[in-house]
Amino acid sequence: VSMNGNWYFHIPMTKNVSEEFSMDHVKHVVGIDRGIRFMITSYDEKGKVTFVSGKEIQKKREHFQQVRSELQSKGTKSAKRALKRISGRENRWMSDVNHQISKTLVTKYKAGTLFVLEDLKGVSFSDDLLGKRSAKDRQELRTWTFYQFEQDLTYKAQALGSQVLKVKPDY
């Protein structure tokens, strides 16, 4: 692949990872809460709390939304092409953010870590449940990439010999 005058060679590979994870071998337990104001808040067995601020992420997403809104109101052919480009750019950027955060967590705690996440399956951000929030807040909640972060953390943890456990959000 040629990009900006440089050539890159992509080599796909498969790594066999042991599916078995024994609770007897747990060295660390890390609870992770996902959110918008703070992308993640983690709490480990030593009582150390780590916050990853979502402020810069939120600003950049607002910028993408503003540009998207302006282009949609124009409605020209070139505006539609630009919208397609921006959409891909925002998705790639958000994927990279999730990748970096999950990679940092997994490398920080090493093998034998049990990451505990709240199970957001079935959680709905419908208008009924969101109440009297602004349209901006509703849109932000609906488009946040909670699941993608969970997927990134899960596969990276398993590759390193750790595990992700999902619990009910009530606890």
Task: Please state what every model-predicted region is.
Residues 3-171:
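Positively charged, helix-rich recognition surfaces that bind polyanionic ligands
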